[in-house]
Amino acid sequence: MSKNLLIELGLEELPAYVVTPSEKQLGERLATFLTENRLSFEDIQTFSTPRRLAVRVSGLAAQQTDLTEDFKGPAKKIALDADGNFSKAAQGFVRGKGLTTDAIEFREVKGEEYVYVTKHEAGKPAKEVLLGVTEVLSAMTFPVSMHWANNSFEYIRPVHTLTVLLNDEALELDFLDIHSGRVSRGHRFLGTETTITSADSYEADLRSQFVIADAKERQEMIVEQIKAIEAAQGVQVDIDADLLNEVLNLVEFPTAFMGSFDAKYLDVPEEVLVTSMKNHQRYFVVRDQEGHLMPNFVSVRNGNDQAIENVIKGNEKVLVARLEDGEFFWREDQKLQIADLVAKLTNVTFHEKIGSLAEHMDRTRVIAASLAKEANLSAEEVTAVDRAAQIYKFDLLTGMVGEFDELQGIMGEKYARLAGEDAAVATAIREHYLPDAAGGALPETKVGAVLALADKLDTLLSFFSVGLIPSGSNDPYALRRATQGIVRILDHFGWRIPMDKLVDSLYDLSFDSLTYANKADVMNFIRARVDKMMGKAVPKDIREAVLESSTFVVPEMLAAAEALVKASHTENYKPAVESLSRAFNLAEKADASVHVDPSLFENEQENTLFAAIQGLTLAGSAAQQLEQVFVLSPVINDFFDNTMVMAEDQALKNNRLAILSDLVSKAKTIAAFNQLNTK
């Protein structure tokens, strides 16, 4: 008869960002443990609050399934000695399996006999196997860990309770000096220690102590309560998904409420108010029906509605202190001069091995000028790029950004506009930080995009030049994100700038502040980001073929990958790729100094292929270019069928290899076709 299993680990308050992934990890690790230990089950449900991680297994088998395994040993000629007795090799083999030589039998495998033994292992009761669940808890990994008391071990937070119930039976085991039982803890202020009656009563037992164990239920409660506030007050609340996920992992019993602040603070830029509420206080922003910010906020209390008015007043008081700071900095920063702030950037360190922020900006300005030409910007845009590059980091020295660093760039744009800077310059100051996340928004203006590219390129080259190169998952300076941003911006704007030539030109630049180095590492790093941009939906062989193309133009590479994926599902893909691959492989033997001499042609097929190559212009979309190459497949095959490429006559051989080399030089602008798999 199946049973239900409950495991709850009671801890000190967990960081909010750890709760959800830890809940998921616990469920996955327990499922693996049960499967590996041959304990079948029907379902696994996970639970979490800031002070607990839990999992319930439904329909758990009462006993392991029996195990029968065959083991192959040494060959018979090795297993038996000259007298026909079992050798030490045979005896050692069966001993290692916990058996005797009586279990040996011989089976023929590919014409030769080998020792075989069959081992039968009866399934153990689930109760006995579950004593090993502490291995699951020990194997949990966390971004941070700590020691406590005089213990030598470390964990995400101190462990206070461990509950392990099989139906209503408490299992006895120990974990980190905690002995398991059936006692859990209720809400820190509203509840008490409570007894969990059974695995099935878990949620109800905790609910009686003001703990909602199911994170999904807490989320639904928060959303429903906010919706009720919206209906009652006639407002709209910005239910930000990330903030919602954070808040539900800060509370065990949620109660949402609305507070207010003086409308005078609405004169401060909206971004300052939103940052104060959302990022610093974990409040939800409130708007009117037209979407305008209102002097209100919604917060979620960890508790019931008892004395809620006092809670509201306390939250309002804390927020006002933040808003006072914002109002002060907004007023005082407007007294500053951009030129004075830029001058002070010479004293701000970009990185101790690289130099000052002013030096970084100087290099960025030079790179931006080069990119502006490559991107065919207008004269007005070129001027805007140059001006933006001279000042774009000035807001880092304002009081507002010093207090609210999330507003860097945003406040720069606002202060630049107030100072009379051109709108394109001001916008670029904000946009140069974009994208600020893996799938974040991209710059919308060409000026902002060029500045963003230049800033990211110098950042990448500078850190690589001083040996600060990401390894493994370690990337403290977010260089992968910066490089991914470079790739995304180039693709978004369709700028066909050859990255290899661009990087070469940057390494030719001379700066007093820094000499660029490690170019090969930089190029490989950029290629890896293009590879990631293609995504797992693009087969590995296609990604590799595109990455080995002769033109490192990001939009064209991504388009080529997409075209090849679509083409791979067509009938002519395999024959076309195979003929092109043959041409690519032979062309590697060509002498680069030899040019095609039509007077050496001995058959019509040579002339036909050469003429087709001469007429190959590769115009249009990536799909159209690919089709133009693929239609040459019959011509290529006809050439191979009627021409001995590797002729004994050296002149003929070199000429024919030169024909193929001409073909490859054009086709390789799309992909290295000999890297494609047609099996």
Swiss-Prot record:
Class in the EC hierarchy, top level: ligase
Disulfide bonds: none
Family matches, as InterPro entries: Gly-tRNA-synth_bsu, Gly-tRNA-synth_heterodimer
Keywords assigned: Aminoacyl-tRNA synthetase, ATP-binding, Cytoplasm, Ligase, Nucleotide-binding, Protein biosynthesis
Enzyme Commission number(s) from the entry: 6.1.1.14
PROSITE patterns found in the cross-reference section: AA_TRNA_LIGASE_II_GLYAB
Pfam families: tRNA_synt_2f
Catalytic activity annotation: tRNA(Gly) + glycine + ATP = glycyl-tRNA(Gly) + AMP + diphosphate
Intracellular or extracellular location(s): Cytoplasm
Transport as UniProt keyword: no
HAMAP family assigned to the protein according to its UniProt record, in alphabetical order: Gly_tRNA_synth_beta
PANTHER family documented for this protein: GLYCINE--TRNA LIGASE, CHLOROPLASTIC_MITOCHONDRIAL 2, GLYCYL-TRNA SYNTHETASE
NCBIfam families assigned: glyS
Protein name (record): Glycine--tRNA ligase beta subunit
Naturally occurring in which organism (per UniProt): Streptococcus pyogenes serotype M3 (strain ATCC BAA-595 / MGAS315)
